[in-house]
Structure formats: C-alpha cells, structure tokens
Amino acid sequence: MYAFDYHRPTSLADAKTLYAQLEDPMYVSGGMTLIPSMKQRLAAPSDLIDLSSLSELEGIEQLNDAQDSMLRVGGMTRHNEVAGNALIQRHFPVLGQVAAAIGDNQVRNRGT
C-alpha cells in the first residue's frame, strides 16, 4: 500500500474544502472497497478524507415538494439501515431487498 495522509473533517463543508486543496484525494466511508484496492496497489490517493463521522450524510428521510414525494438516502447510510427502513419497504421494497442481499451481515453493517 502506498503512503497517504489521513483527514477526518468535522463537517461536509470542511470535507469539500479539503478535497479542493489536496493533490489527489479520495473520499472514504466504510472502506470496504477502497482499502483492499489500495492494498493491491490498484488505487494510490495522496490523501484519504474520511466521511464516516459526518452525520449530515446519514439517514433516510421523506422529502415533499409541490410535485412529488421523494426519499433521500444519505451517502453514509449503512446497507442494513436501508434494508430495514419502513419508508424504503413501503415505497421502494426492491431497494430494501437488494440492500438485504449485499454481502454478509458484517458487510451490511459497515458498508454504505
């Protein structure tokens, strides 16, 4: 694995600023795909920006506007949360089924 610098921003705005300032950064959340790729030398970012502590990227919520009703699934929402969410099961049951079938339970608890 190549050397890299690790950053853990405290807000989404900080993460965006870091990304714009760094040479060849990559965002990391669960790390289930990126870290093995780095170990195999298939990816070599100069910096990793860890998004896992940014609560504004988590969760599932219903959005209502004048034309339609939509769901927002945050990028840091774990697969198991998607699989078990009542809104997902009601409006997009296939998405819940797919999320429940990803990997094993450890992957679903960690993967985003």
Which stretches of residues belong to each language-model region?
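C-terminal structural segment of proteins
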Residues: 1-112
